[in-house]
Design a protein with these regions (language model features):
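Short, well-structured beta-strand/strand-turn elements
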Residues: 2-18, 87
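Extracytoplasmic segments of membrane-associated envelope/inner-membrane machinery
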Residues: 19-94, 100
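Stable alpha-helical elements in mature extracytoplasmic
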Residues: 2, 71, 75-78, 117-124
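Solvent-exposed helix-coil-helix hairpins and adjacent flexible coil/strand "hinge" segments
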Residues: 87-120, 144
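Extracytoplasmic/luminal low-complexity segments enriched in Pro/Gly and acidic/polar residues
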Residues: 111-152
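Short beta-strands and strand-coil junctions in structured, solvent-facing domains, enriched
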Residues: 7-9, 19, 28-32, 46, ...
Length: 152
């Protein structure tokens, strides 16, 4: 039996072969990748069926997945502490990393997910909430700081 959504399975038969039991443990998706696959905690992919609407959507080349997985906890914690939910994470070579929240806030992080980028985002979000600001875009790609866009 070869199904990519199966984590493991067990087939039990009675001593006389009169009945069989099949136990299947399915993989638990952690992300939706490119709206075509699920990815689990072991970074293995399996078919996407449209379920689990609350999973974070990832759109990036496969080789960039580990960069996000290594940085995700601090970003998710930061956003959750401010009652924001990350809906999607993308990487495009021309744009870099960017996040979109459930409130349609776009955060352009730049070329890497470094600690400096995280600290700049943390300070920017703190400033926004202290001053009751609601931009549609936070752009952290500038060396001098962050740009806030209220256009959308």
């Amino acid at each position: 039996m070869q199904q990519n959504w199966i984590e493991n399975f067990l087939i039990k038969s009675s001593f006389f072969g009169t009945f069989h039991q099949i136990f299947i443990q399915s993989k638990k998706p952690k992300y939706v990748w490119k709206d075509k696959f699920y990815i689990d905690t072991k970074v293995s992919t399996f078919g996407y069926d449209g379920g689990y609407p609350d999973l974070i959507r990832l759109d990036m080349p496969f080789e960039y997945l580990t960069f996000w997985i290594n940085a995700e906890n601090q970003y998710i914690t930061l956003f959750n502490d401010l009652s924001l939910t990350i809906r999607s994470v993308s990487f495009q070579p021309a744009v870099g990393w960017y996040l979109i929240t459930s409130d349609a806030l776009r955060v352009n992080l730049g070329d890497d997910l470094s600690n400096d980028t995280y600290q700049k985002l943390s300070l920017t979000l703190k400033y926004m909430f202290e001053n009751n600001l609601t931009p549609s875009i936070i752009d952290l790609r500038y060396k001098a700081g962050a740009a806030l866009n209220y256009g959308k």
